Structure formats: C-alpha cells, structure tokens
C-alpha cells in the first residue's frame, strides 16, 4: 500500500475511479491507496494456496477467489486480499460483480512493503466482516503462517503459528486442510 493517500473520496467516487483504473487501489475510510506490485514468490504463494483450496472445494458450494475480486467491510472499506474464500450465495452490494461482502476465509501473503499494514489496520478492518471465520497470514521468507480464528464470543485469537514443511492448517469452516510443505516448495525458489 502506498503511504500517501491519493485523495479523500466517497465510496461511490472510489468505485467509479477504481472500475476505470488500469491499476488496483484499496479504499480505507475516505482514502484511496494505490497497491504496490508483488514479487514472483508472493505471486506463487498466493497462486498455490488458491490452487489447493480450489481442488479441495470443488462441489462444496464454496470457492476461492484471486486478488481480482474485492472484499468490502461493513464500514465500506474495500480490499483485494491475495486469496479469499466465499460460499454460495456470495453477497454483492448493489448487484456489483467485482466486490463481495461475505468471505469466510481471507489469505494475505506478507511482503516487506505491506507486512505492517496487512497485520495492522487491514486485519482490524477484516475482523469486522461477520462471515469471516479465519484469516491466514503467509510469510514470504520462511515456511511460517499465522492462523487467526474468530471465537464463539466474536473475539479473534491467534490459533497457531505453523512452521516447517510438515505443518498443516485445519480450516473446519470450509472442511479444508492446507499442507504447507508443498505450497512453500513451489514458491521458495522464486525471487521474493
């Protein structure tokens, strides 16, 4: 995320600009922020997580989405998570097809330029999404994933730090399991 806001906007202004833009921007509060590009490793990690979830979710009524589909928070903030999972029917505000409001899982792959933002303000805003059950934060430089889960009292808890090639992440809300070894093996040889 760029450190300088482009301008102060309404959500409607943001959507008009974003839908015509040649690059992606996120909307936080009343500010629009241009997104920085990702590395080859970042792209591979996100792609491999997407592929694994896609294979496991076929026929389940749920599906993973790439960072081309925005997620909207109840406050109107809009983000492009690296991967999100939605279950049918996904809810599109005002009939829009490029944004939805009810993700179940959000995956962010950290990068040096976005790590503080992804774990800070963005995660605070993600937690406001009522349908969200899990948020996974993949580190780009080591086999390490932080798994945050919504608790029955609506609080969020760091469920586990997953380390190493044998680590597995259980996602009971979508009945999936992610094996970290194969995901990271397909990404770590790429520049990061």
Positions of PLM-derived features:
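Gly/Pro/Ser/Thr-rich low-complexity, intrinsically disordered segments predominantly at protein N-termini
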Residues: 1-192
């Amino acid at each position: 995320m760029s450190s300088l806001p482009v301008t102060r906007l309404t959500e409607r202004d943001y959507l008009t600009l974003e839908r015509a833009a040649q690059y992606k921007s996120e909307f936080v509060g009343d500010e629009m922020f241009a997104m920085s590009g990702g590395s080859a490793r970042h792209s591979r990690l996100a792609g491999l997580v997407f592929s694994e979830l896609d294979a496991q979710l076929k026929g389940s009524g749920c599906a993973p989405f790439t960072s081309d589909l925005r997620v909207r928070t109840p406050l109107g903030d809009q983000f492009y998570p690296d991967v999100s999972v939605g279950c049918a029917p996904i809810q599109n505000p005002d009939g829009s097809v490029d944004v939805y409001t009810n993700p179940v899982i959000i995956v962010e792959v950290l990068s040096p330029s976005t790590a503080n933002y992804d774990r800070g303000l963005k995660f605070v805003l993600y937690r406001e999404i009522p349908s969200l059950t899990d948020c996974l934060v993949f580190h780009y430089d080591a086999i390490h994933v932080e798994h945050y889960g919504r608790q029955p009292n609506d609080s969020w808890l760091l469920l586990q730090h997953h380390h190493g090639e044998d680590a597995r992440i259980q996602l009971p809300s979508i009945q999936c399991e992610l094996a970290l070894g194969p995901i990271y093996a397909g990404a770590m040889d790429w520049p990061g």
